[in-house]
UniProtKB/Swiss-Prot annotation:
The gene is trpD. The keyword Transferase applies. This is Anthranilate phosphoribosyltransferase. Pathway: Amino-acid biosynthesis; L-tryptophan biosynthesis; L-tryptophan from chorismate: step 2/5. The keyword Magnesium applies. Mg(2+) 1 binds at residues 108, 241. Keywords: Amino-acid biosynthesis, Aromatic amino acid biosynthesis, Glycosyltransferase, Magnesium, Metal-binding, Transferase, Tryptophan biosynthesis. Anthranilate 2 binds at residue 182. GO terms for molecular function: anthranilate phosphoribosyltransferase activity; magnesium ion binding. It comes from Rhodococcus jostii (strain RHA1).
Amino acid sequence: MQSPTAQGTNDGVRPARTWPSVLGTLTDGRDLSVDEAKWAMDEIMSDNATSAQIAAFGVALKMKGETPEELRGLADSMLGHARKVPVDDDVVDIVGTGGDRSNTVNISTMASLVVAASGIRVVKHGNRAASSKSGGADVLEALGVKINLGPDEVARCVREVGIGFCFAPVFHPALRFAGAPRKEIGIPTVFNVLGPLTNPARPRAGLIGCAFPGLISVVAGVLAQRGNSALVVRGDDGLDELTTSTTSTVHIVADGAVTTRQLDPRDIGIARVSLDELRGGDAEVNAAVARRLFAGETGPVRDAVLLNAAAAIAAFRGLGGRTLEDALSDGLSTAAQSIDSGAAATLLARWAELTSGLATSK
């Protein structure tokens, strides 16, 4: 067990850091400091916390309501325990929290390939499905990409192809200590939103989808504190990405500040569709959808992928004084060219071939 340490506050000195003091702070409805949150996660990631303490922490934090400082402390701890990817931070991630239970096709995964094919390097961080039929890792496997690669292999993929995938269990092995308590309590907690904040490549830009309406501004706040350029989004139909069935809420993170607005896809020439037109299936079904998309199939799925790819491109480039709609319109043209030129299909084939070779040589 780590030795307890005292925490100074404006009102005096808090009790030494122990689980009773941290849990007592939360159950009293008071916020943790960045360092206190980091201490708690360090204990969890070091296997120094019991299942009861982990479960109590997740539930108490959820009931109080998480702050950007708390999420930042937890995420910083996770990154401190993670395996590092040796790439510079001039990359973008396109990722969602999951948990929207919509069972749509893998929009963010397809968008990641489109963005990478446009020449912007992508490091995607993801996992297998938790509440859906197909997660990002599942569909990439079905597309022929080997996902169990280590840091050096992922970095090589980024250098040679322009995209890499960090499979969460490989890069955050210590998170397994929280697995059983999370499963036992059976409700979403802060652990469900940490994935998009803990990409081991530490990208400077991102399109981050958040399925939980009460946490979207908190996630945006963490990214602002880090100085990232990002769009943090939630479809007003509940999707953890930009939707084409209705409007989306968009938190624009730039220069350490957050601005919030609504986006209607019709304002950039994308028709609204029924959410049913974006539904998918298991990994094999969704992989077939991706292959048809990259072969030139048009329709609602293409529109949704282009919209999210455009948003990631806008987050990477920055708005630069443009309106969100203007930045997205520029990104749409770039994304469409990635598909129509065959670049996205070619990139996928090259990536699958490279990862197969790397996996064989491990």
